[in-house]
């Protein structure tokens, strides 16, 4: 997880990338991500059959997707995984079902969640709620869950570093999609977070699928498959900022020794 995280931060210490990448390749060669139970169907969660909004999930998907795109947020969940599946053989591609299941990065997650809630309410949907979830140490920031009735449709996270992404265009609209290294760093963190809303097996399958995409297209370095992008979302701590923070804390605490 830490190695993927380091490779996903273009404003970090990039001088270490070559060494980290060599070690990561060696690790993946000997201990690849594998789960024999994984299939190639959609990894996104659909609504339950008895859900009051079962017949409206395609409309909710369209509204949520357009709202998140228009806000310029970075996709890294099931929707992003589906976009990467286009670079696999046809038999291994995932069906593009309109399941409203999004994970995105936003530098203003509360505002982004509120905007999405308002768009859904403007379309006539009731019981739209925003639920704040606690973070997990310095790995996962506090995040917002958006629900329509009992169904979760999105999680919006604040980045804890500057995470890399690529920009693609679909029907003339720019869409920000996290790099595979960014996505894997989050997925592996979710697996060990021990939260009830993180399906460990599902996330492991998503991580395995992304690893397959990356290995099959490792020589492709353009568009969505560009691995080392300079575009990133969030604020990255630098050596200078760490030293400044250390000096501030020293001045603040020196009289309490």
Predicted segments with their positions:
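Conserved catalytic core of two-metal-ion nucleotidyltransferases
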Residues: 119-164
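N-terminal regions immediately upstream of nucleotidyltransferase
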Residues: 2-58, 257
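Phosphate-handling catalytic interfaces
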Residues: 165-198
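Short, conserved charged micro-motifs
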Residues: 110-117
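Charge-rich, solvent-exposed alpha-helical interaction surfaces
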Residues: 20-23, 119, 252
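Active-site nucleotide-donor binding segment shared across nucleotidyl transfer reactions
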Residues: 57-110
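Structural boundary micro-motifs
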Residues: 13, 17, 197-199, 203-211
